[in-house]
Amino acid sequence: TLLIENLIKELKSRGYSIATIKHDVHGFDIDKKGKDTYKHREAGAETVVISSKNRFAMIKELNEEIEFNDIIKLLLDKDIILVEGYKNSNLRKIEVYRSGVSDKIITPKEKIIAVASDINLNLENIKVIDKNSIKELADLIEKENEFKFEIYQ
């Protein structure tokens, strides 16, 4: 998450509009007990929208997970979409490898753009970048023909 935060800041400083997608395999709830939107959902609304002059959010109950490509379609007005998770998507990826956390590269070679790591890795035909080299990672994203790819952490 820290890597994505830093990439957002760097890419924004370069003038890009950014969207992010975070996949949570455990489920999540962003609503707060006691708030009107929470009460609407508790009363049975399957979809709740909250809107103001500065923000818009929609909470929708699902019977099955929404297709990844359908989420992407909602964000096509942005220059760059950074994705955390969705390791099985067809997008090309920058995989984050952390010593003590990762034990192997899990992204197939044909889908990998680079590995961002906190240790020196010797990977055949795969670019390895220090995960703290935000400018270099942003340069790589900027250089890619397709601005929409995934960062798997």
Question: Could you tell me what each predicted segment is?
Answer:
Residues T1:
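Walker A/P-loop
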Residues R41, I50, L74-L75, I105-P108:
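Solvent-exposed alpha-helices and their adjacent loops that cap or buttress functional pockets
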Residues K60-N88:
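Phosphate-binding/switch loop-helix module in NTP-utilizing enzymes
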